[in-house]
């Protein structure tokens, strides 16, 4: 997958760590906003398609594309990486304001640094424009499969981080892409200079020289990193 580090952690080189979306979003409650609601006639709705438990936000509709109902989307991690799920998944869930809809996508493809797609039932530019501003979710189960040493950000956020001595370093609160590799933003309980509790932060590069194991079943990442770094 483009943009990944290569190699194998067991050989002391940087493993190929995959990236995807920013972080999990609220999956069960819809909060109203001032941006309006998706036009009920804009996309074909299947009442049986309820909001999935493993829905992950992967992008947003930013504009119409052409005159035949296509939409242009911004993928949260860039079309070459975050766009992979937008290209593969044919079932999308859209949220605009407080309203949620299901859309079956008939076609999707890369277009420059964006993704363009055609939701079934979107017949013209006006219909597509009605979807502008909608957040796009897909099922986690519809993400493309990764190699054994690749990971999606959404699966890493929330994992505990410990060093090789077993010292707890905190929990992954977010992932950052610095253009070269991913970085774990690890939060941990700390005490401020005034003696009050605060949230401390560690930034640990997600590369093989520091990351020694990702144990998803155990809910943790093992790193070569000291607590006083």
From Swiss-Prot:
Localisation: Cytoplasm
Transmembrane segments: none
GO term, biological process aspect, one: ribosomal small subunit biogenesis
Occurrences of domain PRC barrel (ranges): 148-229
UniProt keyword list: Chaperone, Cytoplasm, Ribosome biogenesis, rRNA processing
Disulfide cysteine pairs (residue numbers): none
A cellular component annotation (GO) from this entry: cytoplasm
InterPro entries listed in its UniProt record: PRC_barrel-like_sf, PRC_RimM, RimM, RimM_N, RimM_N_sf, Transl_B-barrel_sf
A Pfam family it matches: RimM
Top-rank taxon, per record: Bacteria
Primary localization: cytoplasm
GO terms, molecular function: ribosome binding
Region (Disordered): 1-37
Coiled-coil spans in chain: none
Protein task: An accessory protein needed during the final step in the assembly of 30S ribosomal subunit, possibly for assembly of the head region. Essential for efficient processing of 16S rRNA. May be needed both before and after RbfA during the maturation of 16S rRNA. It has affinity for free ribosomal 30S subunits but not for 70S ribosomes.
Domain notes: The PRC barrel domain binds ribosomal protein uS19.
Quaternary organization: Binds ribosomal protein uS19.
Family: Belongs to the RimM family.
Protein name: Ribosome maturation factor RimM
Organism in which the protein naturally occurs: Burkholderia pseudomallei (strain 668)
């Amino acid at each position: 997958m483009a943009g990944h580090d290569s190699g194998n952690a067991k050989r002391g080189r940087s493993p190929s760590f995959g990236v995807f979306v920013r972080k999990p979003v609220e999956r069960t409650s819809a909060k109203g906003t001032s941006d309006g609601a998706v036009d009920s006639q804009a996309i074909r709705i299947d009442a049986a398609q309820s909001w999935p438990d493993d829905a992950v936000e992967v992008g947003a509709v930013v504009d119409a594309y052409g005159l035949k109902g296509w939409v242009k989307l911004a993928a949260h991690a860039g079309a070459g990486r975050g766009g992979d799920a937008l290209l593969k998944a044919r079932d999308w869930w859209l949220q605009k304001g407080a309203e949620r809809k299901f859309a079956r996508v008939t076609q999707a493809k890369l277009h420059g640094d964006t993704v363009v797609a055609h939701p079934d039932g979107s017949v013209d530019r006006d219909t597509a424009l009605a979807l502008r501003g909608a957040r796009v979710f897909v099922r986690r189960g519809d993400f493309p499969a990764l190699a054994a040493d690749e990971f999606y950000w959404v699966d890493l956020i929330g994992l505990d981080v410990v060093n090789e001595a077993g010292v707890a370093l905190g929990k992954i609160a977010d992932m950052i892409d610095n253009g070269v590799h991913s970085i774990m933003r690890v939060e941990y309980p700390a005490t401020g200079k005034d003696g009050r509790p605060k949230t401390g932060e560690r930034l640990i590069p997600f590369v093989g020289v520091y990351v020694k194991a990702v144990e998803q079943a155990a809910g943790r990442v093992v790193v070569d990193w000291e607590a006083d770094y």
